[in-house]
């Protein structure tokens, strides 16, 4: 059994999603948003809120793995810089707890969860709800964070399967 904490970083709202993985089965443990605006409008206060929030989630859920979405360089470079700083606050909280960081692009996450890297937010929300058998549709940031965790779960499982096959090839037993 592996517990995965997924993070969808944002300088105002940072989504989080926690799942349990047993082989190729996923179970929902929790999700939501760290609202960084409540501590004030200045960026330093928001980053502190993100750091403290992620640290608390790590204490609460005791994840084995930590996965986070990479920064997308869009039209607004200032927004990308703030997003990078929000990611940094979350990553430092994870590394302070001894967790290894896995990073995935938005396209990789959508591909793993929906089957196409060009999926929209509604498709991601629908698939997260379906895969985790949730009673309702999760809020967008929480759904994205759960998708990050699911992506890591799929990636981690695939890597383990490939490693097992590589060992068999080395031993000359793959059929």
From Swiss-Prot:
Binding-site residues for Mg(2+) 1, renumbered to this chain: 8, 141
Active site, UniProt feature: 8, 69, 141
Cofactor section: Mg(2+)
Chain coiled-coil ranges: none
Main localization (coarse): cytoplasm
The reaction(s) this protein catalyses: Endonucleolytic cleavage at a junction such as a reciprocal single-stranded crossover between two homologous DNA duplexes (Holliday junction)
Residues the record lists as binding Mg(2+) 2: 69
Keywords: Cytoplasm, DNA damage, DNA recombination, DNA repair, DNA-binding, Endonuclease, Hydrolase, Magnesium, Metal-binding, Nuclease
Free-text cofactor note: Binds 2 Mg(2+) ion per subunit.
GO CC term, one of those recorded: cytoplasm
A biological-process GO annotation: DNA recombination
Subcellular location: Cytoplasm
Complex formation: Homodimer which binds Holliday junction (HJ) DNA. The HJ becomes 2-fold symmetrical on binding to RuvC with unstacked arms; it has a different conformation from HJ DNA in complex with RuvA. In the full resolvosome a probable DNA-RuvA(4)-RuvB(12)-RuvC(2) complex forms which resolves the HJ.
Family: Belongs to the RuvC family.
Protein function: The RuvA-RuvB-RuvC complex processes Holliday junction (HJ) DNA during genetic recombination and DNA repair. Endonuclease that resolves HJ intermediates. Cleaves cruciform DNA by making single-stranded nicks across the HJ at symmetrical positions within the homologous arms, yielding a 5'-phosphate and a 3'-hydroxyl group; requires a central core of homology in the junction. The consensus cleavage sequence is 5'-(A/T)TT(C/G)-3'. Cleavage occurs on the 3'-side of the TT dinucleotide at the point of strand exchange.
Entry protein name: Crossover junction endodeoxyribonuclease RuvC
Organism: Colwellia psychrerythraea (strain 34H / ATCC BAA-681) (Vibrio psychroerythus)
Chain's gene name: ruvC
């Amino acid at each position: 059994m592996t517990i995965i904490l997924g993070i969808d970083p944002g300088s105002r709202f940072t989504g989080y999603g926690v799942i349990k993985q047993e082989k190729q089965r996923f179970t929902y443990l929790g999700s939501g948003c760290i609202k960084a605006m409540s501590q004030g409008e200045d960026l330093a206060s928001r980053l502190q809120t993100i750091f403290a929030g992620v640290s608390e989630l790590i204490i609460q859920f005791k994840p084995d793995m930590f996965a986070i979405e990479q920064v997308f360089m869009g039209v607004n470079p200032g927004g990308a810089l703030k997003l990078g700083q929000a990611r940094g606050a979350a990553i430092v909280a994870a590394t302070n707890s001894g967790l290894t960081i896995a990073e995935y692009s938005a396209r990789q996450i959508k591909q793993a969860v929906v089957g196409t890297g060009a999926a929209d937010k509604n498709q991601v929300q629908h698939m997260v709800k379906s895969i985790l058998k949730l009673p309702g549709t999760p809020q967008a940031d929480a759904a994205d964070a759960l998708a990050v965790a699911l992506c890591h779960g799929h990636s981690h499982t695939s890597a383990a399967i490939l490693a097992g096959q590589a060992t068999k090839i080395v031993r000359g037993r793959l059929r």
